Amino acid sequence: MKIGILGGSFDPAHKGHLAISKEAKKRFKLEKIIWAVTKKNPLKSESNTPITKKIKDCKKVIGLNSFIKVKFYENIIKSNKTIDLINHLKKNKNFEIYFLMGADNLINFHRWHKSKLISQKCNIVVFDRHGYKKNSLKSKTFKK
């Protein structure tokens, strides 16, 4: 099964998240997309928004797009690391994972925990984000 993962703090969730989810579903023929909500992105400043509100807001943005599921895995896998989520999802399922991100995240992807392993275990899909294309194309990850 081909699935997409859009991970993040979703603080706030917005139409851009929905747009890249729809585009990824169409372009890569994904059966479902998981919005994996985290309490805190380790590379961003602290969020004061409760996880329950983030999940509620994500569901509001998603609306009737039933191919998108909002999940909070940190209480299950005891981690907010992307590699731990990927390992958890692949453990009992035959998933082909497409990890979706905006160009702003590509800039610092080399700083993510086990970023090389992430890119070996799933397909990384980067979407342009206004104002970030130039810097993302200069990033250490892009140059590799």
Residue ranges and their predicted role:
Residues 1-144:
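Nucleotidyltransferase catalytic core that binds NTPs
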